[in-house]
Curated annotation (Swiss-Prot):
Source species, domain of life: Eukaryota
Name of the featured protein: Uncharacterized protein YPL119C-A
Chief subcellular location: membrane
Naturally occurring in which organism (per UniProt): Saccharomyces cerevisiae (strain ATCC 204508 / S288c)
Keywords: Membrane, Transmembrane, Transmembrane helix
Topology in membrane: Single-pass membrane protein
Subcellular location, record wording: Membrane
Entry GO CC: membrane
Transmembrane intervals: 21-41
Amino acid sequence: MHPLVDELTLSRYLTHGTSVLSSSLYSVAFFLFFFPNFLFFCSCPNHKWVSLPFIGMDILEALCFYREGKIRNIFEIGGLLLQSFYN
């Protein structure tokens, strides 16, 4: 078999493995950060972002904005996080 074919096959497997891993990480992030925040928000709508899961939700939201291209660099992510702490 040609060496280029082997590298191409390996590249496809690695790409697929990376996408499966990233989707798994998004699932874990959802259950760790979004779901507890949703339950707490339903029980107490006037809450502040005080505990780790809720701060984590802000970080996850900022990273999603970065991935969608709504924010361009790490300083804007930091600004969003600071804004969420003071609101």
